[in-house]
Amino acid sequence: MIEVLRAVGIVPVVKINRAAPAAGLARALCEGGLPAVEITFRTPAAADAIREACAAAPEAFVCAGTVLTAQQAEQAVAAGAKAIVSPGINMEVVDWCLAQGVPVIPGCATPSEIEACMRKGLRLVKLFPAEVLGGVRMLKALAGPYAGVSFMATGGISPANVGDYLRQKNIVCCGGSWIVPEAALDAGDFDAIRRLAAEARAIVDSI
């Protein structure tokens, strides 16, 4: 999983209101050079959207995001999600994923939370909310004591700062919501999403 995410570099983070556009979304992201997406459990459509995305673009690394309960994790995996991402550490979710052999990326905001994940054998965690926590400065501070831990940074990431994040040795990838504007998704404007994905891909390739 880590190498797949490292190759993608930027994972689009998506709130989807209806499952219907998920197929076109997944194809547009792949065509734009970002074969990954984090579909968040912020709406009731999440599980069905994951199912549609996986069916339309089996080559895409489809994650479930904002997973707050083990039940949501189970729904996501049943729909085809390849990994579970959460904004914080819910050990119920972590333990369920580990028992099922499902990759899980819990959110961490403190050294203590990072160490809690390390005790579970996890070496990739989500730094969230990244910019509020200090962003690149925070990552540099964590690199010394936690040399064996890598991060997915999400929260406040934009085209203006994502390059600075990706240059950090302890960053695997960043999550970004700007690639899939809600208005474009609701309107089915996949050309706009494809273009934004290609622009993000160009940033990754320039690092």
Stretches with model-predicted labels:
Residues M1-K82, A99, G148, P159-A160, ...:
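Conserved N-terminal beta1-alpha1 strand-loop-helix module at the mouth
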